[in-house]
């Protein structure tokens, strides 16, 4: 299907199109799914103007009506898979982490959440034939856990076979250059970084290395520290809900993978079984497409359990965290 140019939208001339692109709205679909208020603020346009533009974009993109299951299946053909290169984990995900979806990793400290995030920041730059997506990575760091030295170790530790003809594996420095890191200092700043990600993705697409992975490590840390106590819970959940939906719209527009890590807490009311539960409640639970519980095991092993998915059965996979990266047991 041929992509539509935003200048084809009735009422959008070259000047307006430039404003929209600068704000990160580079496709007709991204405009069609925006709200008038968001579009007006981002592109500095009048709200009445943005309402007309959004209406026209929805008509062009055929968004807002019912579609048959066949139509949905056809769109699913655009979904790509990002591999961890650990066969057991990739099988758990049905071939890898999906684009146009949010995958949540939750678990206690040291369970491997940030390690998997670092590994995928490397892997996403590989060509599709080698399990990657041939793109760049945006990494929103809320806990100061991003370590470039770890990226270098993982880049050097890649074990690749059957390289495509003419393909040269990037150097560790080249891998690092394609990971764009932003340190979030507050929940509001974290939410604004999704808007900044739209603008940066526009530039990177033009450079030939589109954004194919967006990582937030961790999703709830800043929200949790700023909104303490039950009296602030409603406000926190409202902001978190908006943040998650903005993230989903971003990766849906970019056909990219969203990976978020999440903290956990103990459920004191549970008398039997594992009392560990993720932060964020139903808001995160309903918005994340895939939820994976990570926990430590014996002899340095880690266990990844897929606990929620719209199309895959529950299951477990084991892996090791080594100097060279995430590896099979």
Swiss-Prot record:
InterPro entries: AAA+_ATPase, DNA_recomb/repair_Rad51_C, DNA_recomb/repair_RadA, DNA_recomb/repair_RecA-like, DNA_repair_Rad51/TF_NusA_a-hlx, P-loop_NTPase, RecA_ATP-bd, RecA_monomer-monomer_interface. GO terms for molecular function: ATP binding; ATP hydrolysis activity; ATP-dependent DNA damage sensor activity; damaged DNA binding. One of its GO terms (biological process) is DNA recombination. Keywords: ATP-binding, DNA damage, DNA recombination, DNA-binding, Nucleotide-binding. ATP binds at residues 107-114. Pfam families: HHH_5, Rad51. Belongs to the eukaryotic RecA-like protein family. Involved in DNA repair and in homologous recombination. Binds and assemble on single-stranded DNA to form a nucleoprotein filament. Hydrolyzes ATP in a ssDNA-dependent manner and promotes DNA strand exchange between homologous DNA molecules. HAMAP family: RadA_arch. This is DNA repair and recombination protein RadA.
